[in-house]
A protein has these predicted regions:
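C-terminal output helix
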Residues: 91, 109-118
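Alpha4 helix (beta4-alpha4-beta5 surface) of REC/receiver domains from two-component response regulators
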Residues: 65, 88-103
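Helix N-cap/capping motif at the beta->alpha junctions
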Residues: 33-42, 63-65
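Receiver (REC) domain active-site loop signature in two-component systems and cognate sites
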Residues: 58
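Charged docking surfaces used in two-component/phosphorelay signaling
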Residues: 18-26
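Active-site beta3 strand of CheY-like receiver
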Residues: 47-53
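Conserved Asp/Asn-Gly motif in the active-site loop of CheY-like receiver
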Residues: 34-38, 93, 111
Length: 127
């Protein structure tokens, strides 16, 4: 039996990380956490996750800088990255996608929203 995909949750809010972890674990996925982009980049140098749920606004290194750094790394597998933020302007969404994000979700989100995105990117199947 193969291991379940590893999902890296990157958010400066411990509450958001916990909520996302609870959802991902309930879907049978493995999780790891980072509280800012720099920690996420360091984590990915050691262990390449299959999926990254990445907040935009964080200290140390913001999400878009982290995304660009991740896309500049030779990661195997290349992680699926879903940007997650309160920023909803079309310019922000375009910037995230042009920087290498695979998808984009708005905060606050719930289990159904995250499940839909995970299904869209092929990480889980919708029941």
């Amino acid at each position: 039996m193969s291991q379940q995909p590893l999902c890296l949750i990157v958010d400066d809010s411990r509450v958001i990380r916990r909520m996302a972890k609870d959802i991902l674990v309930s879907l049978g996925l493995r999780t790891a956490e980072a509280e800012h982009g720099l920690a996420a980049v360091e984590f990915c140098r050691r262990t390449a996750p299959e999926f990254v749920l990445l907040d935009w606004n964080m200290p140390e290194m913001d999400g878009i800088s982290c995304l660009r750094a991740l896309r500049g790394m030779d990661l195997n597998p290349r992680p699926i990255v879903v940007m997650c933020t309160t920023e909803n302007g079309l310019a922000k969404i375009r910037e995230a996608l042009e920087s290498g994000a695979d998808e984009y979700i708005m905060k606050p989100y719930d289990r159904e929203v995250l499940l839909d995105k995970l299904a869209q990117v092929g990480l889980v199947e919708r029941a």
